[in-house]
Each structure stands twice: as C-alpha cells, then as structure tokens.
Amino acid sequence: MKIENIIRRVLRESIQIEELGDGFIEVFIMSGDEVVGDMTLETSDNKHYMVVMATIKEEFKGRGLYKQALLELLRIMPNIIIQSAFRSPEAERAWRSLIKQLPNHIGHRIENILDIEMISIFNK
C-alpha cells in the first residue's frame, strides 16, 4: 500500500461523520477502531455548523482529540464554518488552546452576540 493511502486511511479513522437529518450531523471521534467521543453539530444553511454537544471518554481527555476532530472536520468539509457558543469549562479550555495553535490556513473569529461569546473557525 502506498504511503499516501496509509495516511489517508489513518486520517479517516480519526473521525467518522454521520448525517442525522433535519440539519444535524454526528461526528464520532476515533482512537484506532474505538469511538472515544462524539460531537453533534446543527446547521440551518449547510455552511455554519454550531457545536451543540460534545463528549470525550474520561480516559481520553487531555490528548487533544477534540481539537484534532474539529480540524479534521474542516479538512473533510472545507467550505463550512464551525461555531461554538455555549461551552463547558473543559470545552472552553479546548477552544482557547485550539485558537492559539491554529494552522496558518485556518482562520477564526470571536464575536459577542447578546453577551454570548461565539467562536468560529474556518478555512481561509
């Protein structure tokens, strides 16, 4: 197997995406063959996807898998904008860390809407 195919296979294994209908997608966060977390995102326009729920198994927290999953989702779906508004303290730390370490081709925007901080990440 060519190295490019191996790399693509490994990247595909880091997340799996399932369309749930009614504007929702489920992103399964993988470690090898094991589902270690998931995110539910909602869209009304197939462009802006709001994270409405995210979980990671306790033993996998702190490994950056949530941040990796967000970046991988942007790689797979390059024309979307991922948004987060209501974050747990753990998610807040993950988003702050992500913003500090964004690759050069990923942009971000922070807006305050009705006293709620919305963070958006997107491909430039």
Enumerate the language-model features and the residues they cover.
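Conserved beta-hairpin
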Residues: 18-38
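GNAT/GCN5-related N-acetyltransferase fold signature
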Residues: 41-42, 56
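Conserved acetyl-CoA binding element of GNAT-fold acetyltransferases
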Residues: 47-58
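Conserved acetyl-CoA-binding loop-helix of GNAT-fold acetyltransferases
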Residues: 56, 62-75
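C-terminal "cap" of GNAT-fold acetyltransferases
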Residues: 108-124
